[in-house]
Regions:
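Active-site pocket-lining/capping segments in soluble small-molecule metabolic enzymes
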Residues: 2-122, 140-144, 149-231, 238-544, ...
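Hydrophobic alpha-helical bundles that form the membrane domains of multi-pass transporters
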Residues: 134-135
Length: 686
């Protein structure tokens, strides 16, 4: 049988699992009831997971379990219980986002295959290389990559690369969306996204400016396979079984060289049709769409038709059989799938009164494998002359043998737990004085004399600092280059050149918000300050960041204050203490007009249903941040953050005068005036 990249289907519940497997998926991904990125799905029970895995393995289908949410220190004991259950069930891989959880899995179950969730924001070769260093076997690449960018990563890594080929497209780069948590205390990074992006945000009079059409690349699977993609992922653990059946069937058709039934796919679920905009590098307004009444009506019309796809099990696994019939002895049938071998005994053959059983008659009876995952590939007969076995006896022999083979295939093999490792490095000493105050500037124009005098550490985006190297001539040790939040593979070399040149001019440190930028800074020989985008909210994640080379870390602004206080980190920690929090990282700016970027100078906005404007800040025309309209203020609560080593004032759209005034408020402890937010620091996040 020709080997192809796997079709990986979502299984939000038992019905979806059955639809995926019976329609021909090679693998499924599913979550337990807790600690997965689709908490709203039916999900699976820890106690019955071994049976689920066994049923899939009997059919040659791999099972990946998603443990891909951020977890607090307080939740770790319960999460460890889930991990142990997953390992005991003999699954084929575990998807994670949290750096700390990846660290624990690698230490506790070193042979359990580790998969990097798309929430890890892997979008370049540097990020993939760092995952390899951490022991990952498979990576889900960011959805925002083009054909050429996918090819570059596949060619440069030994990991299996997984790519989304069908389903919903998030507006934000996965793992970097905080819109649901900041607006509604339901974190997408913790599996609770409320999808506020599907609400009616307006841009230049255009509605639903954060709602993208669904993706489909189902007609390009052979092309993707040629690029080196090893796994075709279908999104949709919240979708109906019919959706899963249609998507898997379309993928099967595509891999067989047929034209996939996109019309049925569009009918079962779409948002004004489909897009392939990121893959084809056409990041424009044609990518946007919403779910219409017509879309819903089309779905109702095809659901009955799709239910027929999952009525019968189709054999997918070839087996070889050996039938032995000797005088006076029970007939035996041995069956093998190439790995497992079973043998069963049946009735004693009789002397034939008419036609004896020959290989042709036996083949006709034994090839009827319907209702099982098997089909007969080869039959060898050792049949004594003049013997006869009734067809009913041959059928019973076949059924018993195939049942025994399925049972042998379904035996789960738990992963061994490694001996407890030595204790983690000792935590850092708590700061003796007040936290150091630093400023992150969006542009060099915000660099005022007051900022230069009053802030300890100063950071600028890499491209800004590269254009103003004279800033390093005095106090170079204070400056930090903020690496791009999104750096496509073709931009990596330019980033490395800029880093090395700035280092020659005195730069000593870099601010890194993803794994790719972390590795680039490390290879440039710079001190590394982990940024909020690393999503650190627990002690193991802080320890893993230190192991990867971070000298200091900025905790996620989704980390509640009490949880932050209790993080045991071997390196200094800090938080964002002021700023318009970045709610989304975007590669397709919703502020574009039909003419493109036009005369936009990097600052734009979209407007919600209440008339509130959300700023859009473009970085070097490479990516855009959607910002919270209300700035985070802690200026009057600073004593409550004395456990931090540093606090960062994150300036974005502020004028130089506003930057000066805000810095003075933090120096004096003044209370904020006007609309502001405390962010998520004093809220309980779901």
């Amino acid at each position: 049988m020709e080997k192809h990249a796997e079709i990986l289907a979502p299984a939000g519940g038992e019905a979806q699992l059955r639809a995926a497997v019976l329609c021909g998926a090679d693998a499924v991904y599913l979550g337990l009831r807790g600690f997965n990125a689709r908490a709203g799905a039916e999900n699976f029970d820890e106690n019955t997971l071994p049976q689920t895995v066994g049923w899939c393995h009997a059919r040659g289908v791999r099972v990946y379990v998603t443990l891909n949410t951020l977890v607090t220190d307080r939740e770790l004991p319960k999460w460890l219980h889930s991990l142990d259950a997953v390992a005991a069930a003999g699954v084929d891989g575990v998807l994670v986002q949290d750096l700390g959880l990846a660290r624990i899995i690698r230490q506790r179950y070193p042979t359990l295959p580790l998969h990097a969730s798309t929430q890890m924001t892997i979008h370049n070769l540097a990020g993939a290389r760092l995952l390899e260093e951490m022991g990952f076997a498979q990576v889900v690449l960011a959805r925002e990559l083009s054909k050429e960018e996918i090819a570059a990563i596949c060619a440069g890594t030994s990991m299996r690369c997984e790519v989304f080929v069908h389903g919903a497209l998030c507006m934000s780069v996965s793992g970097q969306c905080y819109l649901s948590s900041v607006l509604g205390e339901r974190s997408g990074n913790r599996g609770r996204c409320a999808q506020p992006c599907r609400l009616d945000f307006k841009s230049h009079g255009r509605g639903y400016a954060l709602s993208l059409k669904d993706l489909t690349l189902t007609d390009r699977l052979r092309e993707l396979e040629a690029l080196g993609v090893a796994s075709f992922k279908i999104e949709g653990r919240l979708k109906r079984p019919e959706y899963v059946a249609a998507a898997v069937t379309a993928c099967r058709q595509s891999l067989a060289g047929e034209v996939p039934d996109l019309e049925t796919l569009r009918s079962v679920f779409s948002r004004s049709g489909f897009t392939d905009g990121y893959y084809t590098a056409r990041r424009d307004l044609t990518m946007f769409g919403t779910r219409t009444r017509e879309d819903a009506a089309a779905a109702a019309a095809v659901l009955g038709k799709l239910s027929t796809l999952t009525r019968n099990e189709v054999g997918r696994l070839p087996v070889d059989m050996v039938l032995t019939m000797a005088p006076g002895e029970p007939a035996t049938l041995a069956v093998t799938d190439g790995t497992h071998r079973v043998e069963v005994a049946g009735e004693v053959p009789q002397t034939a009164l008419t036609r004896p059983t020959d290989e042709e008659l036996a083949h006709r009876a034994l090839e009827k494998c319907g209702g099982t995952p098997f089909y007969l590939q080869d039959l060898t007969g050792h049949i004594g002359e003049g013997l006869m076995l009734p067809l009913s006896a041959l059928n019973r022999l076949r059924a018993a043998a195939l049942t025994a083979l399925a049972e042998a295939r379904s035996v789960v093999v738990p992963y061994p737990q490694a001996p407890a490792a030595a204790g983690e490095p000792a935590g850092r000493a708590r700061p003796a004085g007040a936290p150091r105050l630093g400023c992150r500037l969006a542009e060099a124009a915000q660099m005022t004399p007051a900022i230069r005098r009053g802030a300890g550490r100063l950071s600028l985006p890499l491209h800004e600092l590269a254009e103003r190297p004279e800033l390093l001539e005095t106090g170079a040790e204070r400056w930090v280059a903020e690496l791009p939040a999104f750096c496509a593979p073709q931009q990596e070399e330019a980033v490395m050149r800029a880093l090395r040149k700035l280092k020659e001019q005195g730069l000593t440190a870099a601010l890194c918000g993803n794994l790719g930028s972390l590795l680039m800074a490390r290879e440039a020989g710079l001190r590394i300050i982990g940024d909020y985008g690393l999503n650190i909210i627990n002690s193991p994640a802080a320890q893993q960041a230190a192991a990867l080379g971070c000298d200091e870390i900025t905790l996620s602004f989704e980390c509640e204050r009490n949880a932050a206080r209790n993080i045991d980190s071997p390196i200094p920690i800090g938080v964002i203490a002021y700023g318009r929090l970045p709610l989304m990282l975007l590669r397709n700016c919703p502020g574009k007009t039909a003419a493109g970027c036009g005369d936009c100078r990097g600052i734009n906005h979209i407007t919600d249903r209440r008339g509130e404007d959300f700023p859009l800040q473009c970085q070097n025309r490479q990516y855009t941040h959607l910002l919270n309209p209300r700035p985070l203020f802690l200026s009057d609560r600073l004593p409550e953050w004395d456990f931090c080593d540093f606090l960062t004032l994150r300036f974005t759209t502020e004028t130089p005068a506003e930057c000066d005034a805000i810095l003075e408020m933090y120096q004096t402890g003044a209370a904020p005036a006007g609309p502001f937010t405390r962010g998520l620091y004093y809220r309980t996040l779901k």
